[in-house]
Amino acid sequence: MIAKVLSGGLLGIDAYLVEVEVDISLGLPIFSTVGLPDGAVKESKDRVKSAVKNTGYDFPSQRITVNLAPADIKKEGAAFDLPIALGILTASDTILSTSIKDYLIVGELSLDGRVKSIHGGLSLAVAARNSHLKGIIVPKDNALETSVVKGIDVLAVEHLSQVVDFLNGIHEITPIKVDIESIFNTQSAYPVDFSEVKGQEHAKRSIEVAAAGGHNLIMVGPPGAGKTMLAKRIPTILPRMSFEEALETTKIHSVMGLLEPTKALVTHKPFRSPHHTISDAGLIGGGTIPKPGEVSLSHNGVLFLDELPEFKKNALEVMRQPLEDGKVTISRAVSSLTYPARFMLVAAMNPCPCGFYSDPHQECTCTLPQIQRYKAKISGPLLDRIDIHVEIPPVRFRDLSTERTGETSKQIKERVEKARTIQQERFKGKKIYCNAQMVSRHIRKYCQIDESSQRLLERAMEKLGLSARAYTRILKVSRTIADLEEEDHIQPHHISEAIQYRSLDRTLL
């Protein structure tokens, strides 16, 4: 007898339907799986056999053939354990109901029949809804993330016997429901705040501008100046995530198995801070079946690269495409996958190997060739893609000793959100969301400047030797500064401030 159970596989951050066909026939008791299974899928036969027996059901002593269709796509992971077990029990008449065809079923089985969590539950739920299925049966640990998808029943299970009893009509399983609005309200607090940062008003202003326009930022300063402290507080002033952004971000984290069972959605802007020893594949993504890297895990959030010159030069150079396009494409012989990678890059570095080149109180011990080699690790093309450069001086004693606190993250965030609202109105229907994403045609339309601003910008270009890409970055940042001041037109003082944020072109190149 042949039984068919619907399951799903992952391709990038999206899912596709997999039809699990189980045939039980006369012959030697051999269990074979076809349809391009990987090692984990091939090993499922031992997990399934033990789970079925230890749950109290009879396991057929006949030839069992499992086919995973479509057969031309490689299947990976242990999520097929549960549908294979249910297919065997259906083919052997232990499950008599025909309602199994209405559900997409996924789950890894332990040897005692418990159903364990899988990766990509949210993407699989979206695939079930798009295929007009009645519902999806998932492990309990994946219930919250899958329940944010409306239009299908999400049935959370803990044991193989629970699924069998449900399909045979012995017990009911109540679909899981979540309140999306309450999720956003209860998961929106941050443990850090900008009011904790002493001094550094110029740096705070540059970070506010960067957050308001979604601009990339690099901070240069001696050790202990507060670069890391400032960077970790950037997510606290970024605009609240929309449901669409949260859904897309959660998909990526779910596929990588990074979503906590107690969270339905990633509602905080991601903040990723990889170590400088990270490989190209770890940063951009890769593998035989390509997986997302850090640039995709920081999608809709912040990617913080501390000690930027210590990263491998090749790892930094491969970031050019995602910085420019907001996505990363990984090509392999068997497939080519594109992952979203629209993030705010925040980098930090010392001015020299010892860190005290610009410190007025500490003597720099580096030679000029050492400093030049250190700075040369950051290429001009990469630096051109970073809109805002800011020098972070050492914190003054009077700033450290004062009891007065600076602005809170909430106060700064209000101004940032006002500026973003202006940008959303400006770019309505254009598939871009902030000033940093503008391309040439948008810059020509929305970044027009008067004659005095033009002369000011021309002098700066000649004096600093700025590139054509740096010219467009200045215009984008000027537009953001004008938005923060709720000005319709870019004024000369907006241009002047934006030029200040390119001054490191002269010292780094």
Predicted regions mapped to residue ranges:
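Conserved inter-motif catalytic segment of the P-loop NTP-binding fold
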Residues: 245-279, 286-287, 393, 433-442, ...
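Basic, amphipathic alpha-helical bundle interface domains used for macromolecular binding and assembly
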Residues: 40-45, 60, 67-77, 289-290, ...
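Conserved alpha-helical scaffold flanking the Walker A/P-loop in AAA+ ATPase domains
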Residues: 208, 264-265, 270, 280-303, ...
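Walker A/P-loop
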Residues: 219-260
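Walker B catalytic acidic pair
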Residues: 300, 306-307, 318
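Catalytic P-loop NTPase motifs of RecA-like helicase/translocase cores
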Residues: 112, 305-312, 355
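Short loop/turn elements that form and flank the Walker-type P-loop nucleotide-binding site
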Residues: 59-62, 99-100, 132, 150, ...
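Peripheral, non-AAA+ core regions of ATP-driven protein-machinery
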Residues: 1-218, 222-228, 331, 470-471, ...
